[in-house]
Swiss-Prot record:
InterPro entries: Class-I_Pyr_Nuc-Dis_Oxidored (IPR050151), FAD/NAD-bd_sf (IPR036188), FAD/NAD-binding_dom (IPR023753), FAD/NAD-linked_Rdtase_dimer_sf (IPR016156), Pyr_nuc-diS_OxRdtase (IPR001100), Pyr_nucl-diS_OxRdtase_dimer (IPR004099), STH_gammaproteobact (IPR022962). Its cofactor is FAD. This is Soluble pyridine nucleotide transhydrogenase. The keyword Oxidoreductase applies. Keywords: Cytoplasm, FAD, Flavoprotein, NAD, NADP, Oxidoreductase. It is an enzyme of class 1 (oxidoreductase). Belongs to the class-I pyridine nucleotide-disulfide oxidoreductase family. Pfam families: Pyr_redox_2 (PF07992), Pyr_redox_dim (PF02852). It comes from Shigella flexneri. FAD binds at residues 36-45. Homooligomer; probable homooctamer. Its EC number is 1.6.1.1. It catalyses: NAD(+) + NADPH = NADH + NADP(+).
């Protein structure tokens, strides 16, 4: 690369996408700077999203497990923890993650610059530093990995102390008895699980007709039933007309005429890209209505020297995929093309209580495609390992082609689902006839394990053939 610029590449953002790009670039010998607007590296994933919410979920699920276990619990006195106590656990995990990721940059001699970046021209950035000064930086190429933030409608007062989004909920200081959650997407469902697990009343407002409609319908129905059984009130096909804040809580007026009152509101309906402060108009780039950028298969924007990865390009908006996108973009940036590509079937992990995970096609998709598939199921309650640890709620479902035995989709509902799914994913990715449900019958599993669910499901499915 020519060395007439300060850097070969500047990466804007240090979340999973930015980290993947930065590490990929420095490993190829590029001079790289990473710009991070906040004091610590890691981005929204580490500080407000994936890591803290999953740490919260883990703490709450352990409390539920303790209270439901007859060996350890005294049913005259349930174990309880305050939201602040559980947040302390999340803070400890965040600190560990931050130190680890900071070490990645230091060991690889990748410069971290703190401040807000904005484009001046095609190869120049202005960096607004925390001390009020402004630095000018130049680079031959750029990677935009600035992430996303919760969408804020203009008619909702997010400055009110009882109205939260999925970022600010982590700074909640009071103990709510009743929570309204508007938006029943992944974030809304995960927090519904967390609050209900803390014995908080939850009203979950869904703007659609069922939960997480992109899932296999049985998985969606399982979550709905589990929420209903645990006391979460789900209100489908509802939209708010206005949100009224008061000293002791929030009143939500729905377009259907209903009124709901709770101690606080978590607004979790949509996200928008963090592109509004980048002055993209100065380099001729435009975003869509959600602040997202369009890219090609190598993550190039309409400006060939500017790449974008992660939440800022939309689907799939997963930390795991963002890291791979950054790595692929780094390869394309240095070599002009990328030999690596994002896998076709990206696994989905949803950290409700219990978890949901899936990879590949759903039953609804296969039916619409007129694919002759069969189903193999394993109920967790029939597995020795699940009985030992008390994980009786859950199921593993394998969808496979009736004739070729090729695995077409795997769906799991239950504790550890996000871990269990990867066993099946590994077989699905095999080439040359290696992707077959018969693998699970012909291999030997440790016993007792949750992985054994694959053998049970495979036998169940193969026994349906005639």
């Amino acid at each position: 690369m020519p060395h007439s610029y300060d850097y070969d590449a500047i990466v804007i953002g240090s979340g999973p996408g930015g980290e993947g790009a930065a590490m990929g670039l420095v490993k190829q010998g590029a001079r790289v700077a990473v710009i991070e607007r906040y004091q610590n590296v890691g981005g929204g994933c580490t500080h407000w999203g994936t890591i803290p919410s999953k740490a919260l979920r883990h703490a709450v699920s352990r409390i539920i497990e303790f209270n439901q276990n007859p060996l350890y619990s005294d049913h005259s006195r349930l174990l309880r923890s305050s939201f602040a106590d559980i947040l302390n656990h999340a803070d400890n995990v965040i600190n560990q993650q931050t130190r680890m990721r900071q070490g990645f940059y230091e060991r690889n001699h990748c410069e971290i610059l703190q401040g807000n970046a904005r484009f001046v021209d095609e190869h120049t950035l202005a960096l607004d530093c925390p001390d009020g000064s402004v630095e000018t930086l130049t680079a031959e190429k750029f990677v935009i990995a600035c992430g996303s933030r919760p969408y804020h409608p203009t008619d909702v007062d997010f400055t009110h102390p009882r109205i939260y989004d999925s970022d600010s909920i982590l700074s909640m200081h009071h103990e709510p008895r009743h929570v309204l959650i508007y938006g029943a997407g992944v974030i809304g469902c995960e927090y519904a699980s967390i609050f209900r697990g803390m014995d908080v009343k939850v009203d979950l407002i869904n703007t659609r007709d069922r939960l997480l409609a992109f899932l296999d319908q049985e998985m969606s129905d399982s979550l709905s039933y589990h929420f209903w059984n645990s006391g979460v009130v789900i209100r489908h096909n509802e939209e708010y007309e206005k949100i009224e804040s008061c000293d002791d809580g929030v009143i939500m007026h729905l377009k259907s005429g209903k009124k709901l009152k709770a101690d606080c509101l978590l607004y979790a309906n949509g996200r928008t890209g963090n592109t509004d402060s980048l002055a993209l108009q100065n380099i001729g780039l435009e975003t869509d209505s959600r602040g997202q950028l369009k890219v090609n298969s190598m993550y190039q924007t309409a400006q060939p020297h500017v790449y974008a990865v992660g939440d800022v390009i939309g689907y799939p908006s997963l930390a795991s995929a963002a890291y791979d996108q950054g790595r692929i973009a780094a390869q394309a940036l240095v070599k002009g093309e990328a030999t690596a590509h994002l896998i076709e079937d990206i696994p989905t992990g949803i950290y409700t209580i219990p978890e949901i995970s899936s990879v590949g096609k759903t039953e609804q998709q296969l039916t619409a495609m007129k694919v002759p598939y069969e189903v193999g199921r394993a109920q967790f309650k029939h597995l020795a390992r699940a009985q030992i640890v008390g994980m009786n709620v859950g199921t593993l479902k394998i969808l496979f082609h009736r004739e070729t035995k090729e695995i077409l989709g795997i769906h799991c509902f239950g504790e550890r689902a996000a871990e269990i799914i990867h066993i099946g994913q590994a077989i699905m990715e095999q080439k040359g006839g290696g992707n077959t449900i018969e693998y699970f019958v012909n291999t030997t599993f440790n016993y007792p394990t949750m992985a054994e669910a694959y053998r049970v499901a495979a036998l169940n499915g193969l026994n349906r053939l005639f």
